[in-house]
Amino acid sequence: MTDEELHKLAHDLRTPLTVVEGFARMLERGEGRLSPEDRAEFLTRILEAARQMGDIIDGITRPRA
């Protein structure tokens, strides 16, 4: 993998990771003050970002033809 490819991969992973971190922090700070709907939305966003990271990892570990 070239340096350019590694840089793109790091960026592609960092984006959803930032989403996970941000929403997790909001859940942590809003404990007891967030509505059930907000909590559900934050958890949905975290799960979507985690799936996105999983898809990226699957894409780079899949054997190439």
Predicted segments with their positions:
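Conserved C-terminal segment of the DHp
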Residues: 23-34
